From Swiss-Prot:
Homodimer. Homohexamer; ring-shaped, necessary to form the nucleocapsid. Homopentamers; opened pentamers in solution. Binds to viral genomic RNA. Interacts with glycoprotein Gn; this interaction allows packaging of nucleocapsids into virions. The N-terminus is involved in homooligomerization. GO terms for cellular component: helical viral capsid; host cell endoplasmic reticulum-Golgi intermediate compartment; host cell Golgi apparatus; host cell nucleus; ribonucleoprotein complex; viral nucleocapsid. Keywords: Capsid protein, Helical capsid protein, Host cytoplasm, Host Golgi apparatus, Host nucleus, Ribonucleoprotein, RNA-binding, Viral nucleoprotein, Virion. Encapsidates the genomic RNA, protecting it from nucleases. Displays high affinity for single-stranded nucleic acid. The encapsidated genomic RNA is termed the nucleocapsid (NC) or ribonucleoprotein. The ribonucleoprotein has a non-helical structure. Serves as template for viral transcription and replication. After replication, the nucleocapsid is recruited to the host Golgi apparatus by glycoprotein Gn for packaging into virus particles. This is Nucleoprotein. Its main location: virion. RNA binds at residues 32, 35, 68, 72, 110-111, 191, 201, 204, 211. It is found in: Virion; Host cytoplasm; Host nucleus; Host endoplasmic reticulum-Golgi intermediate compartment. The gene is N. It comes from the Viruses.
Length: 253
């Protein structure tokens, strides 16, 4: 068959059906199955509104749950007051909360914390002594008052790696100091590992979060300033610099 025949075949697709229903169905079938914060915000708002809920209040409750109890809502209900268990049961029902290996349209507590990280970083400052790795513990490890806003994996989502003078990389390393302790706490098999081995378990997810484009660079800058990681001149807080130095020493960077 000649090149011209192949060209005619391709051109004939001009007359092929391109109905929106079929195309949209394919879009859903082929959609990225990883974490999409925009989609999580959309689903939370839609599901909460559909049930007549104060969905913003529910978001805050889900974040607090995630910060202090983890990512398994059904399991945590077994060791909770009757009133607390009832609230969690309602959240599970309304928002179809899941755990484990979620698909694109699955809402988990950790995904809520990550998607709504502007509130998560505020809650961390209030809850620092109720977290799996406490603020006091991190202060002892860092040798300074460790930035509370960094004390959750979701913080990676507001790190701007393109900040001038390597500030973004320094923030990422400072956050890594917490992530080493957090990873060992939630995964006992890592407790006997070297720091660089533990770091290897979270580096890729952290990089994916830092590379996300849900929040603009301007958004990230505003958030980092708001929680005291950088100042208006984009200068790092001294505690961030010290924490990053500790991390680098631990992992041999």
């Amino acid at each position: 068959m000649s090149d011209e025949n192949y060209r005619d075949i391709a051109l004939a697709f001009l007359d092929e059906s391109a109905d929106s229903g079929t195309i949209n169905a394919w879009v859903n079938e082929f959609a990225y199955q990883g974490f999409d914060p925009k989609r999580i915000v959309q689903l939370v708002k839609e599901r909460g509104t559909a049930k007549g809920r104060d969905w913003k209040k529910d978001v805050k409750m889900m974040i607090v749950l995630n910060l202090v109890r983890g990512n398994k809502p059904e399991a945590m209900m077994k060791k909770m007051s009757e009133k607390g268990a009832s609230i969690v049961a309602n959240l599970i029902s309304v928002y179809q909360l899941k755990e484990g290996n979620p698909g694109r349209d699955t809402i988990t507590l950790s995904r809520v914390s990550a998607a709504f990280v502007p509130w998560t970083v505020q809650a961390l400052r209030v809850l620092s002594e109720s977290l799996p790795v406490s603020g006091t513990t991190m202060d002892a490890i860092a040798g300074v008052t460790y930035p509370r806003a960094m004390m959750h994996p979701s913080f990676a989502g507001i790190i701007d790696l393109d900040l001038p003078n390597g500030a973004g990389a320094t923030i990422a390393d400072a956050h890594g100091l917490f992530m080493i302790e957090f990873s060992k706490t939630i995964n006992p098999s890592l407790r006997t590992k070297q720091a660089n081995e533990v770091a290897a378990t979270f580096e890729k997810p952290n990089m994916a979060a830092m590379s996300g484009r849900f929040f603009t660079r301007e958004d990230k800058k505003k958030l980092l300033i708001a929680v005291g990681i950088i100042d208006e001149d984009l200068v790092l807080a001294s505690a961030v610099v010290r924490s990053a130095e500790k991390y680098r020493a631990k992992v041999g960077k």
